[in-house]
A protein has these predicted regions:
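Preference for intrinsically disordered or flexible, low-complexity segments
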Residues: 1-195
Length: 195
């Protein structure tokens, strides 16, 4: 199993991390939501964690409203209107956080390879083709669900903003050929299921 471990240890933006900002190329605009507001950066990891031998980095963004911190829960579905973004890019450029500086500094994410079998109903944060759905299975045309992140792990990675995804699981859908796409570019989206 490729397990994702979220640590409280502070991280550099050039390393795999949750929270904080990220190093987007200077010619790439920060993702915005349907109202034009900057999205919250959730995490950045190497593409090789998902597709062995591939180059580049993946950064994950979600709409987030500081006044109503649960508003984004209802919008992150496989239906139309989902404004979340996964970007494929080189991990270079100017450090930015899209205006969410005060929420949480960057914290370490590690990939742990284990011999532990992947169980269908296990909600461990992981990179996998074997996904445990909290509710019903979701599908996004032209994409495959390649990763799931337990909401409790975001409470570690985004310690300054607890509850961003409490009581649920974030599912990462990437385009089936994402690792061959030109960088930088949009290559996926997030969905969220909660109990």
């Amino acid at each position: 199993m490729k397990r994702l471990r979220f640590k409280a240890t502070l991280a550099d933006l050039a390393e795999p991390h949750a929270g904080g900002g990220c190093l987007l190329p200077d010619d790439r605009y920060w993702p915005v939501d349907s109202k034009g507001d900057p999205q919250l950066h959730l995490m950045t990891i190497p593409t090789a964690w998902v597709e062995e031998g591939s180059e580049g980095w993946l950064s994950f963004f979600t709409p987030y409203d500081r006044e109503d911190t649960y508003l984004h829960w209802e919008t992150l579905t496989s239906e139309a209107g989902n404004a979340s973004v996964v970007l494929l890019h080189d991990n270079s450029g100017t450090a930015s956080s899209g205006g969410h500086d005060a929420l949480s500094p960057a914290r370490t994410i590690q990939l742990e390879l284990t011999d532990e079998p992947e169980r269908c109903r296990q909600f461990t944060s992981r990179v996998s083709q074997h996904i445990a759905w909290l509710k019903g299975r979701e599908q996004v045309e032209g994409h495959a669900c390649r990763m799931m992140v337990n909401g409790d792990d975001f409470d570690v990675g985004l310690a300054g903003a607890p509850g961003v995804f409490s009581d649920g699981v974030v599912y990462v859908f990437l385009s089936t050929d994402f690792h061959t796409q030109c960088r930088p570019g949009t290559c996926g989206l997030l969905t969220f299921q909660f109990s």
